Amino acid sequence: MASERNQTGEMAAGRDVLVGALVGHFSGRGPREELPKEVLRELGQELAASGLVRDELVAFWNLLEEGLGRVGYRRPSGGEVTVLNLACGPCIEGAIFGAYFGEPGGVDGGRNRVRMFGMDLRGQEIEKAKRRYAATEEIFRGAGLPLLRESADETAAEVEFFADDATRLVGYKEIPEAFDVVFIRHQNVWNDRLAWRKIYAFALGAVAEGGLMVITSYFDREHLIALELVKMLGGEVVVSVRNPRTVELDAPGKSADRHLAVIRRKA
């Protein structure tokens, strides 16, 4: 009973942290204390209704903190972070990435500008991603907070979604040739090993010097297969973390972000 209460308390605290980070990402506001409590309460309720602060995503935020923390990753302060989200699907995690990497690495530092690019072959999924992100922005607009990207602030986030083959990414103008973070959430190597070999090879090649590739997996065995394939392609698995708050899904042994791995390119 005490354990359940502790877990409930941890998730509630995690939701508060996530709401505060999302406020920062979309409006550029600083600490939560700068906003009236009634505004924060309204935002929390709206974000909960949208599904953006459900338990699965609170656990995902905490998993990012743990996995990247273990490899000594430190966000810049007042800098820029480029993120490529491959096979992003409807990309419910898009706002999470923006909020996470936008947080300053130091106590006195300013917010980071996050340039995030989501890519998926499936055009319908990309349209869902665009609508979802726009709907989340509308929540903050409805709460009376001006959106950071609509201001002249240089820290405004840039978020774009593309329906195309990732290997043709370099054909788009204004997109970096390499990224600080290349992310694949819920990789699916079981679906088509040859196709995923190509995706992993491209992902590793798109990592900037000193950057990271991060993957999460639904299944234990599939995660191990993915890591072996990444190693064969020249990746170094720096850390692999089991998610202690993973949310069970629709098949035995399947759960959201069951494992997370942080990978570097071998020198």
Model-derived regions, located:
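A short acidic, Gly/Pro-enriched loop at the edge of an enzyme's catalytic core
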Residues: G171-V182
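Conserved SAM/SAH-binding beta-strand->alpha-helix loop
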Residues: R122
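S-adenosyl-L-methionine
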Residues: K130-Y172
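Class I SAM-dependent methyltransferase Rossmann-like catalytic core
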Residues: T8-P76
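Conserved SAM-binding loop of SAM-dependent methyltransferases across substrates and taxa
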Residues: P90-R111
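A short SAM/SAH-binding and catalytic strip from SAM-dependent methyltransferases
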Residues: D180-L194
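Conserved beta-strand signature within the Rossmann-like core of class I S-adenosyl-L-methionine
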Residues: G210-Y218
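A short glycine-rich, Lys/Arg-flanked "PGG" loop and its adjoining helix->strand segment in the class I
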Residues: A195-E209
